[in-house]
Amino acid sequence: MKKSVQKNVKGKQVNLKVKPSVHDLSKTQQTKLTVGSMGLGLIIIQHGPYLQISHLITKGAAARDGTLQPGDVLISVGYANVLGYTLREFLKLLQHITIGTILQIKVYRDFIDIPQEWQEIYDLIPETKFPITRTTKKTEEAKDGSVTSSDDDEAFDTRLKYYKYPRSTGHYPVRRPMSISREWHGYKKKNHVMRVGKDINCDVMIHRDHKKEVRAPSPYWTMVKQDNEISSSSSASSTSDAFWLEDCTPVEKGSSEPVSRVG
């Protein structure tokens, strides 16, 4: 509590009690960052009505600058006041900013704490680790043959091996997590053979069109054909008689079998 002394019109002293501010928002930080290939190098979450920095990307612009820290609340980015912005509105703002642009960023320090659930999943965010490039089998064999294991290799963080992609999944860009849905439910082309015929066991069955009046083969023509196969000495008169009998065989409308009449 602070006391201030003021004089009234008659010259008497009056003691006024002044309460200090409950929220001290004067603790602000500001810096200038250059937009790079990884943006500003910040991982930002929506914490109530504020945009809060949860993590810094290793080797990003913010990590190299060293001014911003996890837990800072964004006040302004460039000329835009982002207090009350949602993550979607903030993303639209960053989409119009090109690489190489220098932005002045202003934040609140020690204003609100990072939610506990975001602090526990730090190791599950691949962007917090530095990019790991894939090495081919030939380069790995060359390293095994020429270079032996050293203390630096033993001090390497084993948790980073978790982010290496398996060989069977094909080529993926650096720093891009593998899509489980695309890997499990991807379209796989298979060859299928379909059988077409008049048999009922075929995949595609051909049916006869009964609407058309199709003339069945004449039994006389079959008889003459079999006689020709057995004996080659058939006369021309028997063949002509068979054709004459076939021509005289009419087809009744609406019936599938021919009726032979000789008149």
UniProtKB/Swiss-Prot annotation:
Organism: Bos taurus
PDZ domain: residues covered: 30-109
SUPFAM superfamilies recorded: PDZ domain-like (SSF50156)
Superkingdom field: Eukaryota
Record's protein name: PDZ domain-containing protein 9
PANTHER family named among the record's database cross-references: PDZ DOMAIN-CONTAINING PROTEIN 9
